[in-house]
Amino acid sequence: MPIIYMNITLAFIISLLGMLVYRSHLMSSLLCLEGMMLSLFMMSTLMALNMHFPLANIMPIALLVFAACEAAVGLALLVSISNMYGLDHIHNLNLLQC
């Protein structure tokens, strides 16, 4: 396995561990989720470049579109929760209390 693939896999694992450790605040969770999406984007781009198949280039673009949608929804949720409760704690997302 080349060193670049190991670095990208390590970045994904570190972001995943950050998601598990810093799950009390929504902003920290969103940043870790963006790190995971960035490492997946880099991995899919490298795989598409190495495959030399023209139709494989659409996968990184689709992943980038989904990451942008996820970021927009996450930030809208963060603004809504911080306006409603004044904090960005994850435990405020309990649907039974709304």
UniProtKB/Swiss-Prot annotation:
Binding partners and assembly: Core subunit of respiratory chain NADH dehydrogenase (Complex I) which is composed of 45 different subunits.
Source organism of the structure: Piliocolobus badius (Western red colobus)
EC number: 7.1.1.2
Compartments (UniProt record): Mitochondrion inner membrane
CC per GO annotation: mitochondrial inner membrane; respiratory chain complex I
Gene: MT-ND4L
Keyword set, alphabetical order: Electron transport, Membrane, Mitochondrion, Mitochondrion inner membrane, NAD, Respiratory chain, Translocase, Transmembrane, Transmembrane helix, Transport, Ubiquinone
Alphabetical list of Gene3D superfamilies matching this protein: 1.10.287.3510
Protein name: NADH-ubiquinone oxidoreductase chain 4L
Membrane topology: Multi-pass membrane protein
Molecular function in Gene Ontology: NADH dehydrogenase (ubiquinone) activity
Pfam families: Oxidored_q2
Keyword Cytoplasm: no
Family: Belongs to the complex I subunit 4L family.
Principal cellular location given in the protein's record: mitochondrion
Role: Core subunit of the mitochondrial membrane respiratory chain NADH dehydrogenase (Complex I) which catalyzes electron transfer from NADH through the respiratory chain, using ubiquinone as an electron acceptor. Part of the enzyme membrane arm which is embedded in the lipid bilayer and involved in proton translocation.
TM stretches of this protein: 1-21, 29-49, 61-81
Keyword Acetylation appears in the UniProt entry: no
Top EC class of this enzyme: translocase
